[in-house]
Every structure is written in structure tokens, then in C-alpha cells.
Amino acid sequence: MLKSALGDLILRPWFDRAALKILTTWYFPLSRAWAEAVAAEGSAERFFAALPARRRSDRLVPRILTLVQRRCEALKAAEEAWLHAFFGPGPAQIDVEAERLSRAAQLMGLRSLFAPLHLEHPFPAVAWRVEDKASVERRHSERLREPARAFVQRNGPEAIEPSRGFINGDGVDGWLRFPSPVPAIGPQAWARVGTPLPEARRRLDPQPTLVFAHGIGMEPEYWGYQREPITGLLQSGIRVILPELPWHGRRRMAHSYGGEPILALGVGGLLDFFHAAVLEIGLLVAWARATRGGPVAVGGVSLGALTAQLVATVARHWPEEMRPDALFLVAPSQALEAVAFEGSLSCGLGVPGALQAAGWTLEETTRWRPLLNPVGDPVMSPDQVVVLLGVADDVTLAEGGEALVAAWRVPPANVFRCDAGHFSTSLALSRDGAPLERLLSLLSALG
């Protein structure tokens, strides 16, 4: 559909305004109720302790919680079978993965059941628990004093355990798991790997890899894995690694929906998230290089782009094998503090007000820039950086993306702009393959 004439109508700023409204007034609030329903484990008393009671709650909530609990149990059983198939004795079959995805999507889709209650008495979009300045200082000040040691890699690629794989369309799909480098995030990190089939693999030798990170709240491992434009690179012989970012999917924090702690915990949550995500991507780069030997690009969309751009500068302090060779950014921004205080999604969810209520000002947030924003030039040449910007992006802010491109002196041939807002910019990849073709040409030349 996006490649048809209808795509010209959809991929416009009006779409982004509508998407923003749906996210802030419906998706995030319903996700808030859903998260507490999952945590309640069927108990109405526990659910009501977390969220205020409503007139219709006594009738609807017990029935909803019963269904949520059944779906949770079904997903747990499917995930146990999945672990046995792909990380245990097997056999690794596509039907096992299809069952896991189906059960996960069925549970995720129960958000809609809370719509009648939300209409009666709106749920909050975020359960705020912003960490105070003294606590953040205590936990992260040493990292701020020594930027060169702020993202120290303590594990090597040997810590990564690959799963069995299965043929899925144009490639062989599998997963990676390894210990999370930051205890505050949780014990386990995950990534999905798509490897080209032998015929496509022979087109590029040694084989390049792209490590591509998703945006906030995007949980393809739970909503349903789709062959998005990025994974189309498999046909060209490029392996694709899709990390499951901290606090998303399998890594979701109890009483939270996917990505919520990044917002709810304030500056402390951002520092923990980027600390873990950056180290994890660096480790995936090293694993990719050790297993195929070809050039490795890192990239991402929105929050994933903010993570990848930080990897690109932090990697100066890492061993050679952990340094990416190229960068692919969709909707990035130079200043995260501006995104938090001025971005339309942040403002629509109440981030600035929550930070200010906890005593955080823009100036105090700016102090932590060296741990949140790219400082200095990327580890790779500007010629190896490809950027896609939406000229009407008011979420990660178009001017922030332009500032990054200018500061890094990215060649004009590597910068692509579309007349779109934040959400439609990423969708534009399905319509215009030029940015990915440019990345492919760079990786081919590097190989």
C-alpha cells in the first residue's frame, strides 16, 4: 500500500499528527492498564491498588483479569516450548516460533479491553517514579567524571549464546542471548538474527552485518515479527541483527509496559537504558565480526537511532573489534535533552512536567549530556554515515537531526530527507529504498 499512490497521501505530516494523538491519548494509557493487569495475576484487589476504581470496574475488571491471566499462562507455556526448541535439545521448528508469536500477540492485544474504562475515567499514560537528583548523582557521577570509562565493556563475544535457526522466507532466523552488562536492566539480553540463504550470502564475501535497533515501545518479538524493509537486506547478502532493547519484550519490567521505565524513571532511567543498550550493541558488533568477518554497521530508528549514534562516538574507547564500520540513522537528533523537554511525544506524555515536579530543570539535565548524547566525531568516517530525516519531525526534532548531520559533516549524498513527520519517516523506507541502497553500496565497498 505504501508503494502505491495512496502512500503519497499517507506519508505526510497529517499522518504523524493523528498517530501522535492515538499514542498519547489511547495506546500508552491502555498499555498502562494492561501492564497492571498482567502484574495483578488475576487479582482485582492488586489491580485496583495500582489504578483508581471506576464505576464499571467491578463488573468488567474481574473478567478482563481472568482473560489476561489465561493469555499470560498460554504465552509462558509457548515460551518454554520455544526455549526447549531453539536453546535446548530441539527440534527447532518454525511452528514453535509461530505459536510463540501468536500467543504473545494475543496477550498484547488485550489492551483494547480497557477502552470502556478509559473512556469513563482516563488512565494515566505513564506511572511516574522519577529518580531524584541525589540518587542519580550517587549512581552515575563516577561515569560522568571519567567519560573514557563511562561505557566499559566487561564481556567479550564469547558470552553470546546463539540459538538453533530455521528457514524463514529469504533467510535463516535465530536468536542470541547473553548476560546484560548493567544489573539495573535485568539479567538477560536478547537479539534476533536473520542470516541470508547461501545463494545470497555468496554475493558478498566476507559477509556484512547490520545491527539495527528499534524505537520506544516497539516490540516486534511480541506484537508479531514482520519482514520489514531492513530485513530485505537479506536478499542482498547482508546479515541483520535486531536487538531487543532494554525494558522491551522479554525484558519488560514488572508493572510496566514495553519502554515505560525509560520515561517513568526520568534522567536515571535514560542513563541506565543507554548504558546497557550501548554496551549490548558494542558486544553484538564484536560477535558479528567474530562470526562472519565482514564490515559491521549499526543503526536504528528514533530511540534506536539515538542509541546507535551514541555507540558511534563511545566506540572510540573500545577495542577495534567492537567498533562499527558504518552507521545508518533514521530520525536521529543531536540533543536528547531537547527531545525530552520539547519533543511532541515527550510533551504529549507529560515528560517535562514530571521532570520539573521532581526537581529537574533543562539545565540540570544538560549536565548529563556526555552519557546521553554523541560527543565529538563518530569512530567511522563521515563518508560511512547514512541518515534519513523527516523535515517535519517534531518528536526527535528535525533541527536536531540537521544539527547532527552538520556537526559530523555527513556528505550530502548520504543524507536523505522526506516531507514527513517522525512516524511516517520510518515508514518511508518501505516506499523509497534509496537510503538502504546507499548503505548497501557502502557495506559492499567496505567488504
Report residues per predicted region.
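N-terminal targeting or regulatory segments adjacent to alpha/beta-hydrolase or S9 domains
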Residues: 1-175
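Hydrolase active-site cap/lid region
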Residues: 310-360
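C-terminal catalytic histidine-bearing segment of alpha/beta-hydrolase fold enzymes
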Residues: 402-447
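Gly/Ala-rich beta-loop-alpha elbow adjacent to hydrolase catalytic centers
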Residues: 299-308
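Alpha/beta-hydrolase active-site loop
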Residues: 254-291
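Short, surface-exposed "cap/lid" segments of acyl-processing enzymes
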Residues: 183-258
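Acidic catalytic loop of the alpha/beta-hydrolase fold
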Residues: 336-337, 352, 391-397, 422-423
